[in-house]
From Swiss-Prot:
It catalyses: 7-carboxy-7-deazaguanine + NH4(+) + ATP = 7-cyano-7-deazaguanine + ADP + phosphate + H2O + H(+). This is 7-cyano-7-deazaguanine synthase. Gene3D superfamilies: HUPs. It comes from Helicobacter pylori (strain P12). Its cofactor is Zn(2+).
Length: 228
């Protein structure tokens, strides 16, 4: 793998930052790609840019601001949907879910990988702590990998090394990679865009579903460390 190129879907969050460091140790070249899809807070993109610079990795942003016009999610900047409720289009999903977001991201990453000659795409998705998003599950990833390769006569691999790791295990992975401090202080997870309050697990409001999941994971990580 050391001679191969890997394209990473990069949001500047805990998952994709840990993934980027993992990939940097394994591939000759790593390219980070972020998406501006009219999410509520630009802080996500700002953190991604800073982390990319700290990791000395190339970073590009693809604009997808049209998504807000064709579907609904509490993550959109103009949305009035209240966080923590069911999705307006599907009561079985959280309203932070953006329908087909990962399918669109992966399709564009696949095109980009073909352009630069990359044989690998890496995603920070996990079905252990997946927030109720069906497009983070392994069966979806395998299906879209097969479909895109079939439709473009390619054999690009979609790697998901975090697929079966929970947040506590991801904190441990960051520690093992030597970037725990970076993950805590520089990555962004909070749905509310809060960057004024630094908790033990990182910046955030401490109340939104993303903060709660990250907080729980960090507490489990710390508890396990006490017995090692």
């Amino acid at each position: 793998m050391e001679q191969e190129i890997c394209v990473i879907s990069f949001s500047g969050g805990q998952d994709s930052t840990t993934l980027a460091v993992w990939a940097k140790k394994r591939f000759k070249k790593v390219c980070l790609v972020g998406f501006d899809y009219a999410q509520k807070h630009s802080v996500e993109l700002e953190c991604a840019q800073k982390i990319a610079s700290l990791l000395q990795l190339p970073y590009e942003i693809i604009s997808l601001d049209f998504l807000e016009n064709i579907t609904r999610s509490a993550l959109f900047k103009n949305s009035n949907d209240l966080m923590g409720h069911s999705h307006a289009q599907n009561k079985d999903l959280p309203n932070s879910f953006v329908p087909n977001r990962n399918a669109i991201f992966i399709t564009l990453l696949h095109s980009y990988a073909q352009k630069i000659g990359a044989s690998n795409i890496a995603l920070g998705v996990s079905q252990a702590d997946f927030s109720g998003y069906p497009d983070c599950k392994e069966d979806f990833i395998k299906s879209i990998e097969h479909a895109l390769n079939l439709g473009s006569n390619t054999a690009i691999k979609i790697l998901t090394p975090l697929m079966f790791l929970n947040k506590a295990q991801e904190f441990q992975m960051a520690k093992d990679l030597g970037v725990l401090d970076l993950v805590i202080k520089e990555t962004h997870t909070c749905y509310q865009g809060e960057r004024r309050i630094l908790h033990a697990y990182g910046y955030g409001c401490g109340e939104c579903p993303a903060c709660q999941l990250r907080k729980k994971g960090y507490e489990e990580f710390q508890a396990k460390a006490l017995f090692q």
